[in-house]
Curated annotation (Swiss-Prot):
Domain BPL/LPL catalytic, residue spans: 34-212
Protein name: Octanoyltransferase
Entry GO terms, CC: cytoplasm
EC number, as in UniProt: 2.3.1.181
UniProt xrefs under InterPro entries: aa-tRNA-synth_II/BPL/LPL, BPL_LPL_catalytic, Octanoyltransferase, Octanoyltransferase_CS
Family the entry assigns: Belongs to the LipB family.
Chain positions of site Lowers pKa of active site Cys: 140
SUPFAM superfamilies (UniProt xref): Class II aaRS and biotin synthetases
Catalyses which reaction(s): octanoyl-[ACP] + L-lysyl-[protein] = N(6)-octanoyl-L-lysyl-[protein] + holo-[ACP] + H(+)
Binding site for substrate: 76-83, 143-145, 156-158
Protein's job: Catalyzes the transfer of endogenously produced octanoic acid from octanoyl-acyl-carrier-protein onto the lipoyl domains of lipoate-dependent enzymes. Lipoyl-ACP can also act as a substrate although octanoyl-ACP is likely to be the physiological substrate.
Length: 226
């Protein structure tokens, strides 16, 4: 059976609010046109903390005004996390009606994408019962936080590749205080983010049965009237 076509937009370091707005527009378009192809955005963010719907500010251990780093509450699931350059962020905009209308299945598949990506580098990624994400030797290297509306997904994955981890020390990452955060460079010293991006997209294609073609984001977004 031939894989369905999807679009992959490989972006650089993008301000969080811009990527958030683009996701919302892509979701709105797919709610209007269920035949629109699935989209995968891969990118990095400048330093920012985001809080999911269930997050508590008690897990933030710094003064955002003093540091100048934005803290933003968004509609994804999960608690507080940190984004910064060197972290591969992936936002799948999928019509889950074409895959499986089951959020547990979807989260499991996202974890599988990460595990297969790590396997390419000889790194064993593992799940932890009762928690969402992927760990390596006890270090959490990937966080997952999603939102699904009318079975269209957005938000997604943050995979620590070569990023500075100091920012995680200011929070209780994902509300989990007893497990350290790590990145892939700890386990593969010469790893490169761009190579990880390629392996991630290949793994995503396998796991979700999609054939991704590169696409400019501007070609996907419908211009809005000013």
């Amino acid at each position: 059976m031939k894989n369905a076509l999807g679009w992959h937009c490989a972006l650089g370091i993008i301000p969080y609010r811009d990527a958030w707005r683009w996701q919302q527009q892509l979701v709105a378009e797919r709610r209007q046109n269920l035949a629109a192809p699935d989209v995968l955005l891969t990118l990095e963010h400048p330093a920012i903390y985001t809080l999911g719907q269930g997050a508590t500010t008690a897990h933030i251990h710094f003064d955002p005004v003093a540091t100048g780093i934005e803290v933003l509450r968004i509609e994804r699931g999960g608690d507080v996390t940190y984004h910064c350059p060197g972290q591969l962020v992936a936002y799948p905009i999928l019509n889950l009606r074409r895959h499986c209308c089951d959020l547990h299945w979807y989260l499991h598949q996202l974890e599988e994408v990460i595990i297969q990506t790590l396997r390419h580098y000889g790194i064993k990624g593992e799940r932890v019962a009762g928690l969402t994400g992927v760990w390596v030797e006890g270090y959490k290297v990937a966080a997952i936080g999603i939102k699904v509306t009318r079975w269209i997904s957005f938000h997604g994955i943050a995979l620590n590749v070569v990023n500075d981890l100091k920012g995680f020390g200011r929070i209780v990452p994902c509300g989990i205080g007893d497990r350290p955060v790590g990145n892939l460079r700890q386990f593969c010293a010469d790893i490169q983010l761009e190579d990880v991006r390629q392996q991630f997209v290949a793994a995503f294609s396998r796991v979700f049965g999609l054939e991704f073609a590169p696409k400019a984001l501007a070609d996907l977004l419908i211009p809005t009237s000013s």
